[in-house]
């Protein structure tokens, strides 16, 4: 329960996940104002905030610079690993809240994207939304490769819009720490 003092407009709440909350399962959470609360006399419905709680076990593997070949720009990025899912992810490499998830085989140094298509958040001026699809780097269809000697990850993406493809490029993630 949260109460507001007269004239107070904001409150901070903390939601803690219990040990029994399953890993990697989205759990819906709704915050509702009490039906008796005086919020807006003209409102037809009381305000509701809907959230998703997600308990994850991703750990930071490395920090680096992710260079996106679509824009040609690099950004600071984090590579994480989930032991539960046995999956890696580059966190927010396009600057749009989208993560690049992939599996990886340390013996071959190759990996494969989990997602078949990513919404990059990029918009082409005449073609619209730009999506990234995995683009194979080898004959087995893997689109992720780690060059261990140079500490550089290579990620093959095909850049697609509704009308077709702009072709494939290789994004890079250079490990800095």
Regions found by a protein language model. Give the residues of each.
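Short, solvent-exposed charged binding patches
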Residues: 26, 46-53
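Short proline/glycine- and polar residue-rich coil/turn motifs
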Residues: 2-10
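Residues that cap or initiate secondary-structure elements
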Residues: 8, 21-23, 37, 57, ...
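Contiguous beta-strand segments of beta-sheet-rich domains
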Residues: 11-36
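Residues at beta-strand starts and edge strands
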Residues: 9-11, 25-27, 86, 151-153
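Beta-sandwich strand segments
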Residues: 36-49
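Ser/Thr/Gly/Pro-rich, low-complexity flexible regions
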Residues: 53-177
